[in-house]
Amino acid sequence: MTSLHTLLFSSLLFFIVFPTFTFSSTLLFQSFNWESWKKEGGFYNSLHNSIDDIANAGITHLWLPPPSQSVAPEGYLPGKLYDLNSSKYGSEAELKSLIKALNQKGIKALADIVINHRTAERKDDKCGYCYFEGGTSDDRLDWDPSFVCRNDPKFPGTGNLDTGGDFDGAPDIDHLNPRVQKELSEWMNWLKTEIGFHGWRFDYVRGYASSITKLYVQNTSPDFAVGEKWDDMKYGGDGKLDYDQNEHRSGLKQWIEEAGGGVLTAFDFTTKGILQSAVKGELWRLKDSQGKPPGMIGIMPGNAVTFIDNHDTFRTWVFPSDKVLLGYVYILTHPGTPCIFYNHYIEWGLKESISKLVAIRNKNGIGSTSSVTIKAAEADLYLAMIDDKVIMKIGPKQDVGTLVPSNFALAYSGLDFAVWEKK
C-alpha cells in the first residue's frame, strides 16, 4: 500500500511540475551561443542565474549544447560520447544539477545530438583517425574503420555508403550498421534516464537519411525533437532572395514526413530567410501566392520551429539587428513553435518585450496550428489576424485604415509594430 501511495504521489507530482504540453503550448529557448563555453565559472553553473527569468517567460523546453567530450570547445566535434566531464560547458554533475533546477520550474531540457560524425582517438595509414573510444570502461561506442562510411572522401572507412551529405571535419559514421544504431540509441536513452534530458535537437540531419532520424526517435521516445535541415535558399541574379521559396519549404515538409512526423519538428529556415529579407522594406514577401505565410508555417505549421537566429546563423546569416524585435513580433504571434535565442533575451535587453509578446500568445491560446488571415502585405506594412483573437502589424506604415476592427484593443506597441487583442 505504501508503494502504491508513493507511486500515485510521484505521478501527481510529475504532472504538477510538467503539465501536459502539446505543440500548441510549446515554447523553446536556445540557452547558448558560439562563445558560451567561455563562461567564467562554467556555462552550466552560469545558467542557473537565468532560470527564473526563463521560466517566467513561459518557456517549456530549453535547448542545451552538445554535452560530450569534443575536440572543438563548442561541442560539435564529439568523440567520447559517454564522457560528460570533459565538456568545456561544465561537468556531468553540474549538468545534472542544472537540469534538475530546470525541471523544478517545469522546464524540460533538450540535448544537442551530434551523430553524423565523430572524432576518434587513434589512427591508421588508410582511414586516418578512425579508432573511437566511447568514454566507458567497457567497449560501448568503441568503434573502428568498419563503422565509418567507405565513401567518406577524407576518412575512407570500410562501412556502408553514406546515406547523406559529407562533413569533412570528422569521419562520417555508418548509420546503417546495426551496432551503431543500437549503441547510439542506448547512449541517448542514457542521456534521458541518467542525466535527465527529455528530448533532442538533431544536428546536421542532412548528413544521413531521414529514415535514420526516424529510427532514433522511435528508439528513444523523446518528449520533443527538432532537426536542423539547413538548405540553401534561391536567390536571383541581383543577389536578392527570390519571392517563391516553395521548393525550400517543401523540402522541410518532405523530411518531416519521411522521418515519421509525430513529436519530430524541423527548424523553419524558410521563414527565417524570408522574414529577415522582408523587414528591410519588403514586407510583401510575407504572403505567398495562395495568401498564406510563405515559410514552412504556411504548409506544415504543427511541425515547424520558427526562430530569428541561432548559434550558427548569428555568425554567418544574421537577422538585421535593428529589426530583431519585429521578427519576434512575427514568430510569437504566428503558428509554429517559436524558439527564443539566448543573445536576444539575455544579452540584448529584449527580455521585457519578448516576455510581453509571449504573454499575449499564451493568453490568447495561439499555438503551432493557429490560423492566419493576412490582411495586408505591402512594402511598408504587414498586418495579419491570428485565430480571430489577435491582430498584429509590423512595418513603418502607421495608417492601417479599417483593417483593425473596433472590437480589438491595443495590447502592445513599439517602433514599427503593434499587437491588438479582441475585447
From Swiss-Prot:
Which one GO biological process term can you cite for this protein? carbohydrate metabolic process
Going by the UniProt record, its keywords in alphabetical order are: Apoplast, Carbohydrate metabolism, Glycosidase, Hydrolase, Metal-binding, Secreted, Signal
Q: What cellular component GO annotations does this protein have? A: apoplast; extracellular region
Residue(s) at site: Transition state stabilizer: 312
* Record: residues binding Ca(2+) 3: 152, 166-167, 170, 172
Residues noted as binding Ca(2+) 2 in the record, renumbered to the chain: 133, 136, 138, 142
Segment forming the signal sequence:
1-24
Q: In which tissues is it expressed?
A: Expressed in leaves, stems, flowers and developing siliques.
* Localization, UniProt: Secreted, Extracellular space, Apoplast
User: In a knockout, what does one observe?
Assistant: Early flowering.
Question: What domain of life does the UniProt record list for this protein's source?
Answer: Eukaryota
Needed co-factor(s): Ca(2+)
Q: What class of enzyme is it?
A: hydrolase
PANTHER family in the record: ALPHA-AMYLASE (PTHR43447)
Protein family membership? Belongs to the glycosyl hydrolase 13 family.
User: What protein name applies here?
Assistant: Alpha-amylase 1
Organism, by scientific name, is: Arabidopsis thaliana
